[in-house]
Amino acid sequence: MVDVIAKGTNELHPTDILFQTPYWAQVKSQMGMAPMAFDIHSSETWGDVLVLIKNHCGHKLALVPQGPEHPPAEGMYGQYLEDLSLALADRLEPDVAFIRYDLPWKSLYADEMQQQGWGSFPEARLREMRMNM
């Protein structure tokens, strides 16, 4: 189970990830996005997350740039993101169409890529099979 609690973007925890900082929230705010910050409470992981709300063609999109910083166990990525998305959806405006994550976590394909000597990721249609709908 994951719960999120809203807070000010100036209260984001210090991090080496530029895209999850109060500075980035300010930059994106000046570019017309609406930044929001949330503390994450979960048995799997902890931390906080910056969410950027963008208006696009009459719809609102939620973007999570390079976050959340702290991943769950590798086998729990999908379930964790589903639970986090549901928790965030309860705190976002109802007209947000979807949440997009640009995860800073180790790829689920990293070990296999190294062992097999792959030069690139599997083709998109195969990677997307892991997508949560």
Range-by-range predicted roles:
Residues M1-V27:
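Short amphipathic alpha-helix that is part of the acyltransferase structural core
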Residues V27-E128:
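Conserved donor-binding loop and adjoining core beta-sheet/short helix segment
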Residues R130-N132:
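Covalent nucleotidyltransferase
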